[in-house]
Amino acid sequence: MDSVIEDVRLRKIIDSRGNPTVEADVLTWNGFGRAAAPSGASTGINEVTSFPDGGVDQVITDVEDLISSEIIGMEAEDIREIDNVLKEIDGTDNFSTIGGNTAVAVSMATAKAAASSYNLPLYKFLGGIMPTQIPFPLGNMINGGAHAGTNAPDIQEFLVIPVGASNITEAITTNINVHRRIKAKIQEKDKTFTGGKGDEGGWAPNLTNEEALEIQFTSCEEVSDETGVLVKPGLDVASSEFWNEKEQKYVYEREGTSRTVEEQIDYIADLIDTYKFFYVEDPIQENDFEAFAELTSKSGKDCLICGDDLFVTNAEILAKGIEAHAGNSLIIKPNQIGTLTDTYNTIKLAKANKYVPVVSHRSGETTDETIAHLAVAFNAPIIKTGAAGGERIAKLNELVRIEEELLNPSMADL
């Protein structure tokens, strides 16, 4: 009876880009949970619908009563059952009635309320008493594409991961050191650079792709040498953003070039080889499993070839990718699929097939820290949540607190 839901409330709040989103409160007899939904700038076509046509305001006026009337009186700990009720209330296969963001906020808030009812942190409630590993933070250093602006690189995110870190504080600090080093190098290259940032806290410079790649690579090498902590580079290409369906080419506007599918595969493979990338996300557009598989065959032994728009945290789509041997890693964003249950099912399938799950933020974030708990609970070895900015640091600082609570903590196995 401790986790019986007594009240559910939804409210409109603002995300890090100044856009409205939804926050859910779930109150039980003996606990309380609060969670907020993020939003993406570059989104996969197969993601669930974020909000109904009337947006957040419709959620507050119409949907709150629909949800509360159905789940008040249920046990918050019965997360699967509550997630199924959310689907039944919605009645569609993509949450177009209540919105995937609404569903995921309620789903996460319910799990947090259940954990609170038993005086447990969320990671222990979901993962049991066994979690001992902390994920490596994959930090955003330079923003381009949909996350930046005019004259920024075409490639959306230039990332780093401190694979040599021995604890989460060292990992976070190392990423921040690289972030600062990159700023200094950008200022050397462009004297007019004033420190502008993109949506995810990475620098938004006036650089070509090649200039950004060189700065990223040399900064990783220098910080690795100076600190003794090995840092490796990564990319989120977000290639669906510049795929031209009519031309059947990848159009790099900043570069003034375009590439066929085969040229794109060769280009990314060459980048992985030249710059020793540890991780490359969405190097191929979201509908091309065949090309994704070809790149994985070429470069997957040396690098994580990660699908975000390709898989959209959807177990059915992931199963298709597994069959095609497309990628060896996937992004996990709960609001892409709408519930914690479906998020967990996708992670479970990924692990069973040796795909590396990367729990991730969105470009439009809040100070909600839930994904830090999910990464630990579900034993994801990597968390992608930026390197700077309050809404990014909220997750990283939560990992510091979680690490303090773990018995014999260690960094994850990569």
Curated annotation (Swiss-Prot):
Location of the protein in the cell: Cytoplasm; Secreted; Cell surface
Family recorded in the similarity comment: Belongs to the enolase family.
A GO term for molecular function: magnesium ion binding
Alphabetical keyword list: Cytoplasm, Glycolysis, Lyase, Magnesium, Metal-binding, Secreted
Task of the protein: Catalyzes the reversible conversion of 2-phosphoglycerate (2-PG) into phosphoenolpyruvate (PEP). It is essential for the degradation of carbohydrates via glycolysis.
E.C. code: 4.2.1.11
Pathway given in the UniProt record: Carbohydrate degradation; glycolysis; pyruvate from D-glyceraldehyde 3-phosphate: step 4/5
Residues that, per the record, bind Mg(2+): 236, 281, 308
Sites where the protein binds (2R)-2-phosphoglycerate: 156, 333, 362-363, 384
Catalytic reaction equation(s): (2R)-2-phosphoglycerate = phosphoenolpyruvate + H2O
Protein name (Swiss-Prot/TrEMBL): Enolase
Top-level enzyme category: lyase
SUPFAM superfamilies: Enolase C-terminal domain-like (SSF51604), Enolase N-terminal domain-like (SSF54826)
